[in-house]
Amino acid sequence: MKVIVDNKIPYIREAIEQIADEVIYAPGKDFTPELVQDADALIIRTRTRCDRSLLAGSKVKFIATATIGFDHIDTAYCREAGITWTNAPGCNSASVAQYIQSTLFILQQTRGMKLNQMTIGIVGVGNVGSKVADVARKLGIQVMLNDLPREEREESTMFASLKSIAEKCDIITFHVPLYKEGKYKTYHLADKHFFHSLKKGAVIMNTSRGEVIETEALLEALRSGILSDAVIDVWEHEPDIDLELLEKVIIGTPHIAGYSADGKANATRMSLEALCRFFRIETDYRITPPEPKNKLISTATYEEASLMIYDPRRDSDALKSHPGLFEQLRGDYPLRREEGAYRIVITK
């Protein structure tokens, strides 16, 4: 079995080389028809577009993307060509929740926002959105949920309309997949009409897909004061991001909200397990991220501990200083562990 692997997928080499007869590692953007022609499987990230132009005439039978999102896979073509694909749902949900929690603490510190007096609207309540809701409730924030597919499927009254969330929420955070058309279209879900309906002074966060928010409409909302702040981890036209938007946001990061080592290890494990199931391979391997240098966090408050473990301002400062290095900052991301890797002692 021959497998082509994105060379930025961590913790995979030892395991995949036990499984496959031949493994080739390549940058995600450099996957070509010639490279994949005689491969049996691909293990990719979002930078590899898997469609007819890449796959036609190849031997590829299986694709695993080590990501939650799968809009870079032409699923209709894969179905037509008999290619099985899989993603890694929920792999980095705790990582995104960590990013949101730290960002909320930054807003509290720097903007005087009293979190226990705020209402947050969570748009998209899957694996990630559910974790974010848990974090918000733990911090004493009132939570409103919007998820039209779930609302219709479950016939539940727990969900609010997007209009209601826009009008009532102090903070709105997006955790939806990208659908460019259809009943549940999310492309430019936050457009000028959405921003004009917002509660004045609201904060917008996006860690889902850049195209969920219309950039020019977001910029106008920031210029006019409709929004007080924005936190943007995903951008339209990545890696060629809008520099005015980067300058205006309080936190702007290079698509790394889900990039904890724990989340990456989960994604790699899920991709390998799916590969082994498809090819009916039995193997025994463990994928664990490196330990942090200092596992003991001793500080006066939980807020301080959270920001000691992960402070997104470091990533934001790096991108704002070097916006042309978007892909490099993302590809060479330093070790970041989640809270469970530490022992936290609150001294106050």
UniProtKB/Swiss-Prot annotation:
**Which BP terms from GO are recorded?**
pyridoxine biosynthetic process
**Signal peptide, first to last residue:** none
Key words, A-Z: Cytoplasm, NAD, Oxidoreductase, Pyridoxine biosynthesis
Q: Does the keyword NAD apply?
A: yes
GO CC aspect terms = cytosol
Quote the catalytic residue positions.
209, 238, 255 (proton donor)
Presence of keyword Repeat: no
Residues involved in NAD(+) binding: 147, 233, 258
Give the GO molecular function terms: 4-phosphoerythronate dehydrogenase activity; glyoxylate reductase (NADPH) activity; hydroxypyruvate reductase [NAD(P)H] activity; NAD binding; protein dimerization activity
Quickly give the catalysed reaction.
4-phospho-D-erythronate + NAD(+) = (R)-3-hydroxy-2-oxo-4-phosphooxybutanoate + NADH + H(+)
* Pathway per the UniProt entry: Cofactor biosynthesis; pyridoxine 5'-phosphate biosynthesis; pyridoxine 5'-phosphate from D-erythrose 4-phosphate: step 2/5
UniProt subcellular location: Cytoplasm
Enzyme Commission designation:
1.1.1.290
Binding, substrate: 46, 67, 259
How does the annotation summarize its subunit structure?
A: Homodimer.
Alphabetized PANTHER family for the sequence: 2-HYDROXYACID DEHYDROGENASE-RELATED, GLYOXYLATE_HYDROXYPYRUVATE REDUCTASE B
Q: Which family does it belong to?
A: Belongs to the D-isomer specific 2-hydroxyacid dehydrogenase family. PdxB subfamily.
Instruction: Quote the HAMAP family the UniProt record gives.
Output: PdxB
Put simply, this protein is called: Erythronate-4-phosphate dehydrogenase
Organism (species): Bacteroides fragilis (strain YCH46)
